[in-house]
UniProtKB/Swiss-Prot annotation:
InterPro entries: Ribosomal_bL12, Ribosomal_bL12_C, Ribosomal_bL12_C/ClpS-like, Ribosomal_bL12_oligo, Ribosomal_bL12_oligo_N_sf. Keywords: Ribonucleoprotein, Ribosomal protein. The keyword Lipid biosynthesis does not apply. Forms part of the ribosomal stalk which helps the ribosome interact with GTP-bound translation factors. Is thus essential for accurate translation. SUPFAM superfamilies: ClpS-like, Ribosomal protein L7/12, oligomerisation (N-terminal) domain. One of its GO terms (cellular component) is cytosolic large ribosomal subunit. This is Large ribosomal subunit protein bL12. Homodimer. Part of the ribosomal stalk of the 50S ribosomal subunit. Forms a multimeric L10(L12)X complex, where L10 forms an elongated spine to which 2 to 4 L12 dimers bind in a sequential fashion. Binds GTP-bound translation factors.
Length: 121
């Protein structure tokens, strides 16, 4: 049997809306498909991460080399020795807030190089 799309289109033009709805239902049943338009999930998790433009750098664990981490925190924040030590001892604690992605990753790298465990939030 040859497929004549022009004849099918001509038949569809002459059909009523009710006939076309029945045709769609029959095609769905016959082939196990749906004519409904797919709906995308709003606000997928990947989209939130991509849209984020400011990050908080959180020290989650100072690690074994606490003195090096205190120095890195002091350099990054401009805080005094006691304040920097208090931040490190109080881990988990936010070291800096609202940094752009590049600055946040730089600070994270410096803290990790000093031996700390760091998370970007």
């Amino acid at each position: 049997m040859a497929f004549d799309k022009d004849a099918i289109i001509a038949s569809l033009k002459e059909a009523s809306i009710l006939d076309l709805a029945d045709l769609v239902k029959a095609i769905e049943d016959e082939f196990g498909v749906s004519a409904a338009a797919p709906v995308a999930a709003a606000g997928a998790a990947g989209d939130d991460a991509a849209a984020k433009d400011s990050f908080d750098v959180e020290l989650t664990e100072p690690g074994q080399a606490k003195i090096g981490v205190i120095k890195a925190v002091r350099d990054a924040t401009g805080l005094g020795l006691k304040e920097s030590k208090d931040l490190v001892d109080g881990a988990p604690s936010v070291i800096k807030k609202d940094l752009n992605e590049s600055d946040a990753n730089d600070l994270k790298s410096k803290l990790e190089a000093a031996g700390a465990t760091v998370a970007l939030k």
